[in-house]
A protein has these predicted regions:
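Surface-exposed, charge/polar-rich loops and edge strands
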Residues: 2, 10-188
Length: 188
């Protein structure tokens, strides 16, 4: 197949996962995030839920510009710096095909989750690994994500983010797998 444009110029659909925010708090609205995405060249931006999940289309070469625009919008609105984790929709589809939760010997499960790692960070320790409270179990990992299940212990669910951050020494963001399924069901 002959390409008429460089791979870097080809449009792709991406998802942005913003760490540690709730849309509607601290002046951070959906419109602020969608407008920041559009101003940076992200076309057809769409917001999912209230936890900072945005999809958009842009050339691969422009992805970092959109990331910076979203990080700036969060900083201006909330006064905090929070990282944005970008993944292509194709990468998310590959993660879904991996079927990390498929054999599910992890019952009873409260949530199935995915934790996104910053670029250049990789989970290399053996899995599965459980938290000291046994409310989180890390079950699978790729070069840019860790899959986990959470359980209710003492009436409270665990969350994988703090465990992964402690082990790797980096900031991460975690999403319920249902959020990823929702994005993949309708990424436009």
């Amino acid at each position: 197949m002959v390409r008429h444009r460089d791979e870097e110029e080809e449009d792709a659909r991406h998802a942005a996962f913003i760490r540690n925010i709730m849309v509607g708090r601290e002046g951070l609205t959906r419109s602020v995030l969608l407008e920041a995405t559009a101003r940076a060249g992200g076309r057809l931006p769409r917001s999912y839920l209230s936890t900072g999940n945005i999809t958009f289309t842009t050339p691969v070469a422009n992805v970092d510009r959109v990331r910076r625009a979203l990080e700036d919008a969060v900083r201006v609105s909330s006064g905090r710096r929070e990282p944005v984790f970008l993944r292509s929709i194709n990468e998310l589809r590959g993660l879904a095909q991996r079927d990390s939760f498929g054999s599910d010997p992890y019952s009873p499960v409260h949530e199935r989750c995915i934790t996104f790692l910053p670029d250049g960070t990789e989970w290399i320790d053996p899995l599965p690994e459980s938290s000291t409270r046994n409310d989180v179990e890390l079950i699978d990992a790729t070069d840019r994500a860790v899959f986990s299940v959470t359980r209710l212990v003492g009436g409270r669910p665990g969350t994988a983010g703090p465990l992964v951050e402690q082990r790797l020494g980096v900031e991460v963001t975690t999403r319920n797998w249902n959020t990823i399924a929702r994005i993949l069901a309708n990424p436009l």
